[in-house]
Amino acid sequence: MTYEEVTAMAAETGLPYAYDHFAEGESPEPPFLVFLYPRSDNFVADGKVYRKINELHFELYTDAKQPEVEEQVEAVLDSHGIVYDKTEVWIPEEKLYEVLYSMEVLNDGNEQEE
């Protein structure tokens, strides 16, 4: 899944979104979505990367528990056949809930042909 495909998937949620963070002073009112690739878990053999696999995070921020917004994000992930794990935390300093969707995606743009 390319960066452009992930961006399109974020747009499908209908929420404001950004990669990693919004610029200083440009953060929208919640709910909003941030996505990023915190690490990779590539398939390697014989000193060669055969499959590039990125960990992808979709971070949903809300100022109150909003199950309907979570369902909106999950519907998009489900429609793309994405398998994800979900965690939630309250961030007291920000007065926001973060619902984290963690998943692994193949980096199709860099797959090597066999």
Can you say where each PLM-predicted feature lies in the sequence?
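Long, contiguous binding/interaction regions
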Residues: 1-57, 61-114
